[in-house]
């Protein structure tokens, strides 16, 4: 008979992957290979991970790259490299995965892990763009233009995932084309993630808070029911 801990871990690995938005390493995309028709013109990415990062990784495990959940297809702890296959659709709907460069890495949450950030699915909801990035004292102010499709989910002191990093929204300014959110980055975040390499104009992957998603759905469903009553 399996212990409860084993059952929970198997359940998570078989059915879904969850993350917390706490980056566990910074890697680098070192090669991209066109898969042609085998994956609808997607690509195979080779990522170099930090030393020791792949020691507990297995084939089929989920790792988030800049907030996008991907499946490990090959790995080598000796060379510190692993590969993932990404479809053309995913490349179109994300940012920073179509070229060589640094990426934030997070292994999927295990049943006994701490939930240090907030619940993150690894499904990118949209791409935002950096409008301002400036160091102020010992911290950094990061402003991101979010598309109008995501604006209704963003609120003061709410959670947002930017390139896989769980962050808190400090300000929200509504705009005609969406909204601009302001984030404060502490030195630890800048040092231990790839966010420090961003600059004005950079595209970033955004994932809204899961709770906000369900609240909006319940409210819209309630309004629809009233309209049809």
Where are these regions (language model features)?
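N-terminal amphipathic/basic-hydrophobic helices that include classical n-h-c signal peptides
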Residues: 1-17
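Conserved loop->alpha-helix
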Residues: 14-229
